[in-house]
């Protein structure tokens, strides 16, 4: 399996975003974050992303956004630092996407990023 390249991280908390960014780097990938005052849609047109890791409680996390991410050619990956794994998985299955919960280990996270 080939690894993904640029990974956009959309987390509600900066500390969580930084942690995920480090885990992305450990896989040899490039973590990316929204610029100040930038919308997710603007970021998706600014750069090509192979994956978007998005907190299921992020204010922009909607079915429409997940469709937009796919339309941009990226793989949406849903996560949560606070919800139960079954709860997040249920939403992910409904949208046909990957998911994980925190805490997670680098290998499990890395498998989410494999194409």
Residues covered by each model-derived region:
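Output/docking surface of receiver
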Residues: 77-115
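Acidic, metal-coordinating helix/loop segments flanking the phosphotransfer/catalytic sites
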Residues: 35-51, 58-59
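Conserved phosphotransfer microenvironments
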Residues: 17, 50-72, 81-88
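Two-component/phosphorelay signaling modules centered on CheY-like receiver
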Residues: 13-32
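Short, structured coil segments at secondary-structure junctions
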Residues: 27, 72-73, 93-96
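Alpha-helical interaction/dimerization surfaces of two-component signaling modules
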Residues: 22-24, 43, 91
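Phosphate-coordination loops involved in phosphoryl transfer and adenosine-cofactor binding
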Residues: 3-6
